[in-house]
From Swiss-Prot:
Keywords, in A-Z order: Capsid protein, Host cytoplasm, Late protein, Viral capsid assembly, Viral release from host cell, Virion
Source organism: Escherichia phage N15 (Bacteriophage N15)
Protein name: Head-tail joining protein
Top-level lineage group: Viruses
InterPro entries associated with the record: Phage_Head-Tail_Connect_sf, Phage_tail_attach_FII
Known role: Plays a role in virion assembly by joining the head and the tail at the last step of morphogenesis. Six Head-tail joining protein bind the DNA-filled capsid after binding to the Head completion protein, in turn binding the pre-assembled tail.
Oligomeric form and interacting partners: May bind Head completion protein and Tail shaft cap.
UniProt-listed SUPFAM superfamilies: Phage tail proteins (SSF69279)
The gene coding this protein: gene 10
Keyword Ribonucleoprotein: no
Entries under Pfam families matching the protein: Phage_attach
An annotated GO cellular component: viral capsid
Locations listed in the record: Virion; Host cytoplasm
Amino acid sequence: MADFDNLFDEAMSRADGAIRGVMGTEAKVMSGTLSGATLVGVFDDPENIGYAGAGIRVEGTSPTLFVKTSTVSQLQRMDTLTINGRQFWVDRVGPDDCGSCHIWLGNGTPPASSRRR
């Protein structure tokens, strides 16, 4: 287990591990450096209730995968994943927080342009 600055961070890391263990879903990496690897994380696909104009990102409407940070250190933008038989692509990997992070996903195949949408 990693060294933590305080007991709270250590407790949060343990809680996150328990949550991933109980609620975790397998995500198969289909492309990139981690191709063939299986990640375990909590998958959240919120209902998309509206659309913003071009070039506007609305936080909270993209699917996410909550994972252990050390397992995704080589995951890159545009890598593809299969979760529950559906294809997704990596939009971005969030910062580490007590050993865990969120991966924001796009639905389907990655866009032709690598420019962030």
